[in-house]
Amino acid sequence: MDLHSCRVWITGASSGIGAALVDALVKEGARVAMTARRADTLEEIAARHRASGAEVLVVPADVADRAAVHGAARAVEAAWGGVDLALFNAGFGRRLQVTNFNAEDFAEIFRVNVFGVMYGIEAVLPRMLERRAGHVAAVASLAGYRGAPTLAGYGSSKAALIHALDSLRFDLEPHGIGVTVITPGYVRTPMTAQHTYWMPALMDVDKAAAVIVRGLRRGRKEIHFPARFSWTLKVLRLLPFPLYERLVRAAVKRGAR
């Protein structure tokens, strides 16, 4: 994918991987429309890039609000005539404890991590289908590969997202629309800064953004990283559950030391 002058719409753009992706995409010469709830932060990012001559657009919205997401997409299309790459990055995690189990925690996570992406795809798809061109990408997580302690909500939302994108790829590619699923491991962001447990293969956010942009440029259908850690987890997906369970419990004990 040629990212120079590419019309990119990215959600979750105010911090973490999203903000780093804005920087990386601008360096590629892309035109970047940024969506997040914090309009003031988006304006600060936009001012910095506009000062260097980049073309950036601020379209604040809460991705859990379907009407707001559609409104943001219409604003980008009105400004630039369309979206070439829709990059859905917004998401959040919460570790759930069975001693305080609440199904609403699942609903809140899914509203952002799954439906927030589906609202965005729903919003941009008609124009992409008309043009028979475009690309959809979303940031899932290696946590979506298999179950892990306290990740019932976050992990299942990312598993749902991976499955949805892998399925949509079959449906959209005949219409000229590409689909990429992005599955990062641990990345140093404001979200992971709150974690107190062991995070193997923790990656710098700018390096993560560079890996994602390189993968998009090369037209990858899946972008997973860090390489050694992600390939290890891919192999673990193939293990019988009793063996997988023993390995996970051992890793948890190691991280608790």
Description of each model-found segment:
Residues S14-S15:
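Conserved glycine-rich cofactor-binding loop
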Residues A30-I45:
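Conserved glycine-rich Rossmann-like NAD(P)H-binding loop of the short-chain dehydrogenase/reductase
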Residues P60-G71, A103:
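The beta1-alpha1 cofactor-binding region of Rossmann-like NAD(H)/NADP(H)-dependent oxidoreductases
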Residues Q97-V98, N102-A107:
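Substrate-binding pocket helix/loop in short-chain dehydrogenase/reductase
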Residues I121, S157:
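Active-site helix of classical SDR
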Residues S141:
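Residue(s) in the substrate-gating loop at a strand-loop-helix junction
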Residues V181, Y197-T232:
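C-terminal helical subdomain
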